[in-house]
Design a protein with these regions (language model features):
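N-terminal Sec-dependent signal peptide, specifically the hydrophobic helical h-region
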Residues: 2-52
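Core motif of extracellular immunoglobulin-like domains
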Residues: 64, 82, 137-139, 181, ...
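N-terminal V-set
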Residues: 70-109, 192-193, 290
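Ligand-binding face of N-terminal immunoglobulin V-set domains in extracellular IgSF glycoproteins
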Residues: 109-152
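Extracellular disulfide-stabilized recognition modules
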Residues: 157-175, 205-206, 225-270, 320-329
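Conserved hydrophobic ligand-interaction patch in extracellular adhesion modules
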Residues: 174-201, 263-264, 272-304
Length: 337
């Protein structure tokens, strides 16, 4: 690939992994839940209102407590089940407990356990949180024919980044968009994440796939070339599109880095292949697009020099805008492929 005429260096990710796990209950992560005791003797479940927040690599507790009439029920016959809501009527098994028996499922094996902080505590501890853990979880407590459920939303600190590959804009169907985000250290963003990014000022005039199969884009500054100047600000929604035959960009989401992005200064211009080798020689690898965005947003990486990133594009992160440094707004500048 031809190097950028202005000269490039390489943006890197350290090979050494930095510890980012949070202690359970630390930093205000754990919410206190008070249980409402009913008079009927039926199982009553209460979870935390709103959401709990962590970051990739952290440890989080999904709060859930239950109450029931001990005289009417054997504690060993109480079944506790955690599932993740993947679609409006679709669920993924996460963790089940019955008496002393415990079982975790799929990617949650080895990372989940009950908190068991006293009687009636069904709270679930998730360690080494991944991007894929984001979403809504259902806590279900069952005793024979009596049961109750509660819902907990797990949110992640992170950053949205719009993405299209070398082939250009509007070239990705839904599954290709999912893959593109994964390859750049992200996942497809949710509507809630995109809406929050819009509230924080994200303005992007190209529609992209979201996690639920809808296509949307955020507008903070209406203009003629972007859906007309007289239309209101907001997240514009094309609705649910055909996942195989229709093509758009992608809105990806990524979170905390297990490492550090830094700029490797070189004495001359580098081609992409030379940048890859320079990173390798330095004990690292060329940063992915999502890693660069995370370094900009979370680690406040600010560099007014462009460098290669993993997909073959040339970018640079700006936290403090200044003269002759890519405009008046902070962000990750893209000089193209």
């Amino acid at each position: 690939m031809r190097p950028w005429a202005g000269g490039t260096a390489a943006l890197l990710v350290l090979a050494g992994v930095l510890s980012s796990a949070a202690l359970p209950g630390a930093g205000g992560r754990k919410k206190v839940v008070h249980v409402l005791e009913g008079d009927s003797g039926a199982v009553v479940v209460q979870t935390a209102p709103g959401k709990v927040v962590t970051h990739r690599g952290g440890t989080i507790i999904l709060p859930c407590r239950y109450h029931y009439d001990v005289a009417a029920h054997d504690p060993d016959e109480i079944r506790l089940k955690w599932t993740k809501v993947t679609e409006p009527m679709a669920f993924e098994d996460v963790f089940v407990a019955l008496g002393a028996a415990r079982r975790a499922f799929g990617s949650y094996r080895g990372r989940t356990a009950l908190q068991e902080d006293g009687f009636g505590d069904a709270s679930l501890v998730i360690r080494n949180v991944t991007l894929q853990d984001y979403g809504r979880y259902e806590c279900e407590v069952t005793d024979e024919l009596e049961d109750d459920t509660g819902m907990v939303k797990l949110d992640l600190e992170g950053v949205i980044f719009p993405y299209h590959p070398r082939l250009g804009r509007y070239t990705l169907n839904f599954r290709e968009a999912q893959q593109a985000c994964r390859e750049q250290d992200g996942i497809l963003a949710s509507h809630d994440q995109l809406h929050q990014a819009w509230l924080e000022g994200l303005d992007w005039c190209n529609a992209g796939w979201l996690q639920d199969g809808s296509v949307q884009y955020p507008i903070s500054r209406p203009r003629e070339q972007c859906g007309r100047k007289d239309t209101p600000v907001g997240v514009r929604n094309y609705g649910y599109r055909h996942k195989d035959s229709e093509h758009y960009d992608a809105f990806c989401f990524t979170s905390n880095l297990n490492g550090k992005v830094y700029f490797l200064k070189t004495f001359r211009k580098l081609s992409y292949a030379e940048a890859v080798q320079a990173c390798k020689d330095n004990g690292a690898a060329v940063a992915k697009v999502g890693q660069l965005y995370a370094a900009w947003k979370i680690q406040l990486l600010d560099r007014c020099e462009a460098g290669w990133v993993e997909d073959g594009s040339i970018r640079y992160p700006i936290v403090n805008p200044r003269a002759r440094c890519g405009g008046r707004e902070p962000g990750v500048r893209n000089l193209g492929f």
